[in-house]
Amino acid sequence: MLGIKRITGAAGLAPKGEPGSWVSDAAREKFMAAYGRVFALWPQPCEEVDIETAAATTRVHAYRQHPGGEPIVLLSAFNAAAWFPHVAALGQDGPVYGIDMPGDANPSVPRALMTPPDACAAWLDELLGKLSDRPAHLVGFSYGGWMAMNQAIRAPGRVASITLLDPAGLTKLDARFWLWMSISGLATLAPMPLRRRFARWLDSPAMLQPELMTLMWAGTRGYHAEPKFPAVLTDDELRSITVPTLLITGARSALLTPTEARARGSLMPHAEVAVVPGSHGGFNRIDELNDRMTAFIEAHATSKQAALPRQPPATEQ
C-alpha cells in the first residue's frame, strides 16, 4: 500500500483518533468540481440535503419519485456516487437515500469519530429518524455492509431489512484482500485498453467510468480519511441480527470465500446467502443485482407496521 501512495500521491489516512479532514481548501475545491459531474449521473430529479445530527453534518442524495413508500438507504465508504446504476430500480416503490459517509472524501462534515461501532450506530439511528418515520431497508457495500450489520446489532429499531453486498466485517482481512486492493489501485492508472482488461478481470465496471475515477483520485489525494477497518463481528453478534438479511458475495470475492459467506451467513437467523459469479456482490451484472435486491426488499416490506416517531426534517441545499 505504501508503494501505491508513493505512485499516486495519495494523502493517506487521518491521524489516529481524529476525524477525516481535507489536505487544503484547493484540494476540496478540486474534489467538489468532480463531485458535481459524478452526481449528474444519478437519475433525476435528485435532491441534495444536509442533515444535522450530534456527530456530523451528513450530505444525503434523495431520489423521491415515490416518496410515500418505504425508504431504502444506501451505505458505503467514500461517498454515494457509485450507486447511480441502482437508484432508479430501487426507487420504483419508495424514496432512495444515498449517504455520504462522514469521515471520508465528500461534503459531509464529521464532528466526532465515526468508526467506533456504538458511535456509528448512534449517528445512523439519528439520521434515519430524520429521513423517515418508517423503518428503512439498508443496502450496504463493503464497509457499508458492516455498517448495516452493526446497525442491526446495536440499533435495530429503525431497520426493516439489510442487504449486504460483499460486506466487510465477516472475516479478517488477509493477503488476498491487500493484493486485490493493490492491483485495483494500480489498474486505475493504466491506459484505457489495459484498464478494460483489468476491469473485466476484477469485475469492476466503475473503473471504466471516467467521472468516477476522477472523483476517486481527487478524494484519495485531497482528503485524510478516517481509517475504516472494522473488527470482525463475533458469532454472538451475528446471531443477534433478527431483521431479514440478504447477503450477496462474489465467488472470487477478496473479502470472503463462498464457504465463509455461507458459514457466517448461517449464523444470522433470517439470512439468505447468494454467491454470484465474479469478484463482487453482482455489480458486474447490474440488472440481475437490481432485480434480486428489489425482490428481497419488496418481500420484506413493513407497510403494515406502526410508524416510528419522526425527527425534524432535513434542510435542502
Regions found by a protein language model. Give the residues of each.
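Acidic catalytic loop of the alpha/beta-hydrolase fold
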Residues: 252-256, 281-282
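Flexible "cap/lid" loop of the alpha/beta hydrolase fold
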Residues: 149, 153, 161-188
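Conserved HGGG/HGGXW glycine-rich cap/lid loop of the alpha/beta-hydrolase fold
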Residues: 59, 63-106
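Conserved alpha/beta-hydrolase catalytic His-Asp/Glu region
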Residues: 173-179, 187-242
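Short beta-strand/loop motif that positions the catalytic acidic residue
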Residues: 241, 247-249
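Active-site loop/oxyanion-hole signature of alpha/beta-hydrolase fold enzymes
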Residues: 97-139
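Catalytic histidine-centered segment of alpha/beta-hydrolase-like enzymes
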Residues: 278-290
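Alpha/beta-hydrolase fold catalytic core
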Residues: 1-71, 94, 134, 287, ...
